[in-house]
Amino acid sequence: MITFDSSALLSYYQARTGLTGAGASGVSASPSRSKAVVPNAPWLSNTSPPASDLVRTALAGRKFIDEGANTSSLKGVSADYKKLFATYQALNTLSALATRAGEKGVTDGEVSRLQTALSKGLGEISGYVQNLSLDQMRLTTGAVMTSDKGTVGVPKATYSYTTDTLYTGQFDDEIPRFKGNVSFDISVKSFGVTSTVTMDLSEMGATPRTMSNVVSYMNGKMKAAGFNTDFSVQRTVGQERTVQVNGKPVKLPATGDDFALRVNGDSVEQLTFSAPTTAPAVYVTTRAGDPDPDKKAETDDGVFETTLTKYSAAGTAGGPGAGAPGGKVFSETLQGTISSVRKSVTGADGSVYMLADVSTAVDGKTDINGQPIKGESDVALLKYDSAGHLLYARSLGATDNASGLSLAVASDGSVAVAGSVSGRLQGAVNGPINNSDSSSTTDSFVTRYDAKGDEQWTVRRGGLQEDEATALAFGSNGVLYVGGRSKSDLPGSVGTDPSGGWDAYLSAFATDGNGQPKALFTQKFGTAENDSVSDIVVNGSQVIVGSKENGQAMLRSFEVTPSVVTENVTKLNQYGAYESVPVTYTKTATLTAGATRDLGSLKGGEIAGLKIDGGQLYVGGYTANNLMSIGGATTAPSGGMDGFVGRMSLDISDTTGDTLTYYGGTGDDTVTGFAVSNGTAWLVGAAGKNLDGEETVGTKDGYVAQVNVGTGAVDWSQRVTGKDGYATPTSVAVSSSGASALDAFGLPGGTMDFSQSNRIVSATAARAGDTFQIRTRERGALTTVTIDANDTLETLADKIKRASGFRAKVETATNGNSRVLKISPASNNATIEIMPGKGGTDVLRSLGIAGGVVRATKTEDGKTVSADGSGPVYGLQLPPELDLTTEAGRKNANMVITRAMSQVRTAYREIADTALGIKNDGTTGSGKTGGTVPAYLKNQVANYQAALNRLTGG
């Protein structure tokens, strides 16, 4: 047996903790030295209030911070201890609230009260810490950093494009999709001159059409034309697969490598892709997943996924490589924070715009394309190219809840989205009687973007009760028409008072000379029951509204006469000088009601949309009414709910040219999306039984159908299934020339735009008017930094430098594919504290910037200390808000609060060690010695002694 002197080991640990001889029993043995007075910490006391008492006092409204609750009978105790203990006790109360919220049997009502108390406590603690003055250290509610680098920024300029996987196999395999007479054109514009290069694979002759051979051929063509742009093969090595055989995992070799095509562009060469033969392309979004996997109605445990699928239209040939008519071109699963796609529309350039509702923690993430989701739910505008690549995402930036309900795209590429919002929406132009930021009552909102995806304006208009915008359409002269429903009068509304629950309305907005939204009119209409606008179409000065009024499908025609003026407006030019420039805009408009038409009862159905195609009006939806008031029926209803498409004159009072076709099976079939192109209609929705003779695929299927409205013939249809056997298509959009040989190469049609907006409010969830604060000394004056609509990273960096008195060094850095801000001290003597904005305007999370203290450091006596010679800094890392309403939120809250409490304990130990002269290496220094020994050191020595007793059998 190996033996040793345990007293020697104990002496070592006593020296490590500053306890020897009489000092080990808590009595100073060195009266000639200055006495260090270290009080017992509250977390070491047996007299701490139980958690239930902390919860009760917090819910009763008692203050969280109480310096008087932690007094010591010891004389000479530093005031720092009292302030630290007050902070700790407040955090301990937060911890008790978070723990209580997760206990069994806690009602939703109590959770709500706990949440309110927690939010109050967070605010109180933050205010206390931010104004705290300590002698030996500094506390911050944020982090402690040598530099603060953002995680969210603006996209870097990249001049490359990588397709999705085109083939899985071996490097020298011939690619099936390259067979046949496959060709496309590339137009290259360089220094104002445009040249076209034709890629016709038949020119390869007998050369095998492998990925490498095809790329070599295309590069030869580009080089011969004198261009720098080239192509390369993107190869991803395949991975072994693991399968279960008789309950045991068995590894199998990879099926092959994945091969994609990469376009390596040049900054001075603009590329436009086209094909000699095209066909319509159909884009369908689908929501899939079992809504109740545990079969318990009281739980909300459904996990859903959203997909975007591209089909080539049936009945037309898209040319070789375009895919079989009615064939699937691609199907992609979208980011999990997309809870639902409400509407999709194709643009004139062939791109696909989608309006999506996004929510936090759907798949463990809290962002949409890197942009943090501020509230429980938000609205996102997503733009994809024809190959399914996301070009940009624009989030609304609501801090509470928002829902997207309509989307419109103008011929010039301008985009508008509309819906409902509750809570705060920073940067919006508000109506005169909107609901407050703290209200859960919804208001209508409309946001307009330019062709680059930069927000032009957002308007929020509401009444005293709930309202929402449900339909949009662009008109001439910059007018945007908005339809919706409201439970109370909207500002400036005219028309008969229907006095129903929900009343329908039609409004119009234009951009005034200063670039702000201007309401032109608001017309209300409907019945004494519930009414709502379903869709709007515009034909010159005619506006046709499709609405559901007391269950009836209604059409209303209006004439709009705008007053367009040209006025001189003073604006700031690109050189920073003001100048007077002429601006043409719609100043006023008058609305005249025209014909109305009742299409019949929907009997529980809905109008899915209105379309104008070939000079005729199309109405799509679903109904249980087998006698709709539309003439010229080409097919009969099938029973239950059926889809329908009606075609009629734009003069809605003229019924002579009516055509009606039903689509459905013996069960109930709904229509959730509707599109028309060249006289052909596409319907998507939930499928019932025996729909078009196709058997059920999953538990609850969806469908896609291509219908010839003139004959009623179904040119092509397909049942759709998805995750867990549940799927419902939610939108459909058609591009008249979106399918072509380009699909074989995974390339998008149209001009490949490598540029991205450099505006902060476009690339992030930040809103104009959002803020954060900066100060350069403890308890110093706070300077507010405000985000403007046109701010870039560079202009924001200049603002931060000025706000810090140029004590901050602010530069742009790289984070993945984004450029972000990086803030650091301009000198060793500079300290910058970054704090959240007030009043719900905080922008730090939207920029991925951590609040806290940024300072230079140095190493001194084994410790990392501030380079300016000030005391240590401790960061509590407390966010402005924590969530107790969900399990994930409670788990996060407990983690955050525990981390903050740990920082306070560390701060206590550090100043106690300093007072007792204990260094990091276990030796004693010239600090204060003697005096009362703190309890945490006694506990450490007791633990060491107990360990030695176990080792030696003592």
Curated annotation (Swiss-Prot):
The keyword Transcription regulation applies. GO terms for biological process: bacterial-type flagellum organization. The keyword Transcription applies. Transmembrane segments: none annotated. SUPFAM superfamilies: Quinoprotein alcohol dehydrogenase-like (SSF50998). InterPro entries: Motility_Chemotaxis_Reg, Quinoprotein_ADH-like_sf. This is Regulatory protein FlaEY.
